[in-house]
A protein has these predicted regions:
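Glycine-aromatic micro-motifs
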Residues: 1-168
Length: 168
């Protein structure tokens, strides 16, 4: 099932046609820190290779991914992670902020635990969905992608999540 949102926020199409990055570059200004497509692909490949086995691959949502996942997934489950907690700890000049007035966004910070929703990716197109997710979450490189244990009602699953990059 592919999730869409009725909200005027981010859509699959905006990510697929790279419109989100263009809008972000406009908003970010001349010294834009928006990642290039090549940087995003290299980042994803560093963690998950193009030929990775994604037959049982999950993504953990703790914020906007819960209500607007926009990824093709076959199953969802309530999940908990340990070692990270949800916190408004990243500043942004795009989306919820501007260059003149940065806004805070949720991230996962070290310590504690967090409850959210795990989405099982459709294995038929998992790598393409991960690339779409990288465009969404890694556009400013403010997050670090991590493979974590997701504790669900159907067992512990390996899953991807994005945690606060302490260097940003």
């Amino acid at each position: 099932m592919t999730s869409t949102s009725d909200s005027p926020g981010m859509t699959r199409e905006m990510l697929q046609n790279w419109r989100v990055a263009a809008l972000a570059r406009e908003r970010d200004g001349a010294d834009s820190s928006i990642a290039t497509e090549e940087q995003l692909l290299a980042s994803r490949r560093q963690l998950i290779a193009d030929d990775a086995d994604c037959s049982d691959f999950w993504v953990f949502g703790y914020g906007s991914l819960i209500y607007n996942p926009i990824i093709d997934h076959t199953h969802r489950a309530i999940a908990s992670i340990y070692g990270y907690h949800r916190r408004f700890c990243l500043w942004t000049k795009i989306g919820r902020g501007s260059p003149e007035c940065p806004g805070l966004v949720l991230s996962l910070d070290r310590g504690g635990s967090c409850r959210g929703v795990a989405f099982q990716l459709n294995p038929q197109n998992a790598i393409a969905e991960l690339d779409l997710l990288w465009r969404r979450e890694m556009m400013t490189l403010a997050y670090q992608p991590r493979l974590l244990s997701l504790h669900t009602e159907i067992g512990v699953k390996l899953g991807l999540d994005f945690v606060a990059n302490p260097n940003r």
